[in-house]
Curated annotation (Swiss-Prot):
Gene3D superfamilies: Nucleoside phosphorylase/phosphoribosyltransferase catalytic domain (3.40.1030.10), Transferase, Pyrimidine Nucleoside Phosphorylase, Chain C (1.20.970.10). Residues 248-271 are annotated as: Disordered. 5-phospho-alpha-D-ribose 1-diphosphate binds at residues 78, 81-82, 86, 88-91, 106-114, 118. It comes from Methanopyrus kandleri (strain AV19 / DSM 6324 / JCM 9639 / NBRC 100938). This is Anthranilate phosphoribosyltransferase. Mg(2+) 2 binds at D225, E226. Belongs to the anthranilate phosphoribosyltransferase family. It catalyses: N-(5-phospho-beta-D-ribosyl)anthranilate + diphosphate = 5-phospho-alpha-D-ribose 1-diphosphate + anthranilate. PANTHER family: ANTHRANILATE PHOSPHORIBOSYLTRANSFERASE (PTHR43285:SF2).
Length: 339
């Protein structure tokens, strides 16, 4: 029986089977029709954490790796594909966490649903998003922040992109993006935002199986794949390779003000970059909704990076960094070093 037939019948794949299937997909061994059928069948069946881990194994076998010499390393990423067009808080949060002393390996791509994805805004800010692995390694080691542009570090994905574009639906690859950081072997902490509440436990289980030391999988209940100041947030905790807790966190619970969705709306890359400089450089007050949402996500990064022992302490440290303009200094160094 073919893998496609098994998936259609509702059978789950084990880790090795999922790895082998992904290697065949990204290795160009299957036709576009076969790949499309498998992607649609998987989505209809639903994924398991074990399947996700196997798919990660397969993708990483074909990835270009980055191996920075740091003791701890964090990634802040979302799946994209959320329901609201918010500004890119996770990217600014990564720069803020780096300014607070936690190295960040940011893995991202261009926009999925908003006007401005992580690659779009960093490019508009002057970062060379096409930097090679050695340059990214230096950025992480010397500045504390490096960006890995997904198409450059996962070149085999070119075999899948035409099918994904033609399908025009979310597939397992939307979920795999945050789990396939090219520096994965060095990543000790991760904040992953998901586009659906149904993905929380699934992704947390995969993150635990992949052995992350500390992780948070988050979903803003108004449909945001980041920690949001506009609503309650569902948060699943991963600690030492185990899913340990699940909680609902409102902005007010961690000392932040609730905002209206329009106050954290996204914009085109040029406008977003201009605003990002103000946020990172301390030009906006600490009670500004976008400053607070950046601090919310940066606080989570500091928590998973083991720089603080609570989300609240991480948020306060992030607010201090932003008020002092130190995150903008990190950005400027990354721009210089990546060019």
């Amino acid at each position: 029986m073919s893998v496609l037939e098994r998936i259609i019948r509702g059978s789950d794949l084990d880790r090795e089977e999922a790895r082998d299937l992904m290697c065949r997909i990204v290795g160009g061994e299957l036709s576009d029709v076969e790949v499309a059928g498998i992607l649609v069948a998987l989505r209809c069946k639903g994924y398991t954490s074990e399947e996700l881990v196997g798919f990660v194994d397969g993708m990483m076998e074909h990835a270009v790796k980055v191996d920075p010499d740091v003791e701890r390393l964090v990634d802040t990423a979302g799946t994209g594909g959320d329901e609201l067009d918010t500004f890119n808080a996770s990217t600014l949060a990564g720069l803020t966490a780096a300014a607070a002393g936690v190295p960040v390996a940011k893995h991202g791509n261009r926009s999925v649903t908003s006007e401005c994805g992580s690659a779009d805004i960093l490019e508009a800010l002057g970062v060379n998003i096409e930097a090679d692995p050695d340059t990214v390694k230096r950025c992480i080691e010397e500045v504390g922040f490096g960006f890995m542009f997904a198409p450059k570090f996962h070149p085999a994905m070119k075999n899948v992109m035409p099918v994904r574009r033609k399908l025009g639906i979310r597939t397992v690859f939307n979920v795999l993006g945050p789990l396939t950081n090219p520096a994965r072997e060095r990543v000790t902490g991760q904040v992953i935002g998901v586009y659906s509440e149904n993905l929380l436990d699934l992704v947390a289980g995969a993150l635990a199986e992949l052995g992350v030391r500390r992780g948070l999988v988050v979903y803003g209940l108004d449909g945001v794949d980041e920690l949001s100041v506009t609503c309650e947030n569902e948060v699943v905790y991963v600690d030492d390779g185990e899913v340990t807790d699940r909680d609902t966190v409102a902005p007010e619970d961690v000392g932040l003000d609730r905002a209206d969705p329009k106050d954290v709306a996204g914009a085109d890359p040029e406008t977003s970059a201009e605003e990002a400089r103000k946020i990172l450089g301390g030009e906006l007050p600490v009670d500004h909704p976008k400053v607070q949402m950046t601090a919310f996500n940066a606080g989570a990064a500091l928590y998973v990076g083991e720089a603080v022992d609570s989300l609240e302490k991480g948020i306060q440290r992030a607010l201090d960094v932003l008020e002092e303009g130190r995150a903008l200094e990190v950005l400027e160094k990354v721009v210089d070093l990546s060019s």
